[in-house]
Swiss-Prot record:
Enzyme Commission designation: 2.7.8.26
Species of origin: Clostridium tetani (strain Massachusetts / E88)
Catalysed reactions listed for this entry: alpha-ribazole + adenosylcob(III)inamide-GDP = adenosylcob(III)alamin + GMP + H(+); alpha-ribazole 5'-phosphate + adenosylcob(III)inamide-GDP = adenosylcob(III)alamin 5'-phosphate + GMP + H(+)
Function as written in the Swiss-Prot or TrEMBL entry: Joins adenosylcobinamide-GDP and alpha-ribazole to generate adenosylcobalamin (Ado-cobalamin). Also synthesizes adenosylcobalamin 5'-phosphate from adenosylcobinamide-GDP and alpha-ribazole 5'-phosphate.
Keywords per UniProt: Cell membrane, Cobalamin biosynthesis, Magnesium, Membrane, Transferase, Transmembrane, Transmembrane helix
Cofactor: Mg(2+)
Top enzyme category: transferase
Record's protein name: Adenosylcobinamide-GDP ribazoletransferase
């Protein structure tokens, strides 16, 4: 029963899907709940796929792609996009010490680099989704958010906190190999079932390479990772996952 509560906690904490229940919120609950993140991605991906299925009957691919992106943002309340913007503002608008970069990341004002990053994020997803829809690989819509959430659990495991306090600290350095293995199983099973073994392996390898590269950047900039880093990694992995799908479709 506690795992069900932890799953509901993740839905309540990481999405805008209403869960009207008082749930335990101890660090142990977040540790167990972290293993469920790919299932959160599965829920988001399935809802986006339903939007695709309905709208593709009445709209062309480019219009459908816009609504898929919009629904994804609404479901998570723009949480990951906010992290992406904060990271680009902090990492690229200032060259200095860790404390100053983190201070910029916490600033509620949106800077030039944040705007550019979000525009690029949306354009990549829009272009990739349009191509994916036109080439009948709609299951990529489901796989992408599953894959990105699994890489977050990987970061929880191998990353270290850049700040003493923060939302990300509920997860970072708070999971064991056990939770990561569970999350990997939750990711690999639907991936193989929907897109096959070969495509799954390629996308997994690319996703984890991108995650390791981003972790290295975070370590150099601020000596670890924060909640913003997690959101940014989610968006970056989703972009690259979609681009890999496009490349595989284009090559074949």
């Amino acid at each position: 029963m506690k795992y069900i509560y932890n799953f509901l906690l993740m839905i309540q904490f990481l999405t805008r899907i209403p869960v009207k229940r008082s749930l335990p919120c101890e660090k142990e609950d977040f540790r167990r709940g972290a293993a469920m993140l790919p299932l959160i991605g599965l829920i988001v991906g399935c809802i986006q796929w339903v939007v695709f299925y309905i709208l593709s009957k009445i709209f062309p691919a480019n219009i459908t792609a816009i609504f898929i992106i919009l629904v994804g943002m609404v479901l998570i309340g723009g949480l990951h996009q906010d992290g992406l913007g904060d990271i680009f503002d902090g990492f690229f608008s200032f060259k200095g010490d860790k404390e100053k970069i983190i201070e910029i990341m916490k600033d509620s004002r949106v800077g030039t680099f944040a705007v550019l990053a979000l525009i690029f994020d949306i354009l990549i997803k829009y272009s990739a989704l349009s191509f994916i829809i036109e080439n009948n690989m709609s299951y990529a819509i489901i796989i992408t958010p599953i894959m990105s959430r699994c890489t977050l659990v990987f970061l929880f495991l191998i990353g270290k906190n850049a700040k003493k306090n923060g939302t990300g600290n509920l997860f970072i350095e708070n999971v064991s190999v056990k939770e990561f293995i569970i999350s990997f199983i939750f990711m690999i099973v639907p991936s193989v079932l929907l897109i096959g073994y070969k495509y799954s392996v390629i996308i997994i390898v690319v996703s984890f390479i991108i995650t390791l590269a981003f972790l290295n950047l975070c370590n150099r900039k601020i000596g670890g990772i924060t909640g913003d880093c997690l959101g940014a990694n989610n968006e970056i992995v989703e972009m690259f996952t979609m681009l890999v799908f496009v490349a595989l479709l284009y090559i074949n």
